[in-house]
Amino acid sequence: MKSVWNSFKAAFAMFSKIPTPMVDWNKENMKYMMCFFPFVGTAIGILTWLVGYVLGSHVQMEPFFLAVILTVIPVFVTGGIHVDGLLDTSDALSSWQERTRRLEILKDSHAGAFAIITACVYFILWLGAWRQLLGDHDGICIMSIGFMMSRCLSGIGVIIFPKARTDGTVAEFSRNASEIVARNVLVMMFAALAVLM
């Protein structure tokens, strides 16, 4: 039971900026970490729904500014780890270099032109989606559930897809995960969330 609690803490420590108690980064504590990855999405979803409800219904904030706030909530909760990965991947894939060079680009901390373009498109699309959904309570709920579902799919991908490198963070998460348990839990969570939508 202790390793399950430690896996929960490890998931929040790695994938969010939400303060969590200290946890040792060892194989036992990372065993079920991917099972709890969607709970970071739960935190984002609940916060997004609450902010949308309070600022939209009670404060009656101007819709465009509310859409801006809803767009940046995931970045504040996660510290931007998901955006960082997207932008690194965009730079690497858009380089059209050989595999080894693309892997070097993934590790490079500098943002290239394609990363900046991808970031602009990413945030504009999110802003547009939120602006369109404001006033539609069901739409905001569905978007909030989507934060959990996307993390279910990401967790499944970490576990079952081939890794670009054998020594990276994702490879370590996959190697230390209880593969069958994590995959089954994530698939069941995804299915339950899909029904809930």
Question: Where would I find each of the regions flagged by the language model?
Answer:
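Selective transmembrane-helix segments that form parts of the transport pathway or gating/packing helices
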Residues: 110-113
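Hydrophobic "anchor" residues on beta-strands that sit immediately upstream
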Residues: 80, 84
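Hydrophobic alpha-helical transmembrane segments
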Residues: 1-79, 94, 98-103, 115-197
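Divalent-cation-assisted or electrostatically stabilized phosphate/pyrophosphate-binding catalytic cores
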Residues: 106
